[in-house]
A protein has these predicted regions:
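Class I SAM-dependent transferase core
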Residues: 41, 52, 60-105, 113-118
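Short, intrinsically disordered, charge-balanced linker/junction segments flanking boundaries
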Residues: 56-60, 64, 184-191
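Proteins with a high burden of low-complexity, intrinsically disordered sequence enriched in S/T/G/P/A and R
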Residues: 34, 46, 75, 79, ...
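S-adenosylmethionine/decaboxylated-SAM
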Residues: 3-10, 97-191
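Membrane-proximal basic amphipathic "stem/tether" segments
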Residues: 1-61
Length: 191
């Protein structure tokens, strides 16, 4: 989608949906402003997940390999979900988020492990997209038999829909999940 057709579709959408259209314009303006700030290069030190968990939780008796097994089914589910989307084009109603929005396996495993060890009663996440990070958190909460994930997200583009937010989350994990629909700046105060 070139810039001109994007702007035309955004203008048409804004006319019929002024509140959401205003939010989209504000988000695009904020993104444009952010692009003017310098990007800092930080030194990178690669650590293994085992080392990170041991540093954060030295008393923990969890073995990473055992915890990794708890996410194998999730990874298969993610693979199946994205296989169904591979022939869809972005942006569209069926593929509203770019694949760059996806979470890699190690980051998902890290979220899962954090929730398994900490056993939180409440988790708040801003931004859901397909729901990959939500899935890993929810898997841990389900296994912990406690905790609730509150995910805040909204529709920011004409091709996005409320139905696609968290669409990758398996239905059996939704018991511990509440989608709070709206902008984070407004809804964080309520959550």
């Amino acid at each position: 989608m070139n810039n001109l057709s994007f702007l035309a579709s955004l203008l048409a959408y804004t006319i019929t949906n002024p509140k959401i259209g205003r939010q989209i314009l504000q988000a695009k303006y904020q993104s444009w402003q952010d692009s003017g700030y310098p990007v800092f290069n930080y030194a990178e030190k690669k650590l293994q997940l085992d080392d990170i968990i041991k540093a954060l939780f030295p008393e923990s008796s969890y073995l990473i390999e055992d915890l990794r097994k708890g996410t194998d089914k999730l990874q298969n589910h993610v693979d199946d979900f994205f296989n169904k989307l591979k022939n869809e084009t972005y942006p569209s109603k069926k593929k509203p988020y770019p694949l760059e929005y996806t979470l890699d396996n190690k980051s998902g495993l890290f979220l899962y492990i954090l929730c398994k060890i900490i056993k939180p009663e409440k988790v708040v996440e801003t931004g859901v997209a397909y729901g990959l990070s939500s899935m890993y958190i929810l898997q841990a909460l389900s296994e912990n038999k406690k905790g609730m994930l509150y995910s805040i997200d909204s529709v920011f583009s004409p091709w996005q829909s409320k139905e696609m937010i968290g669409s990758a989350i398996p239905s059996h994990l939704c018991e511990n999940w509440r989608l709070v629909f709206g902008s984070s700046s407004e809804k964080l105060k309520e959550t």
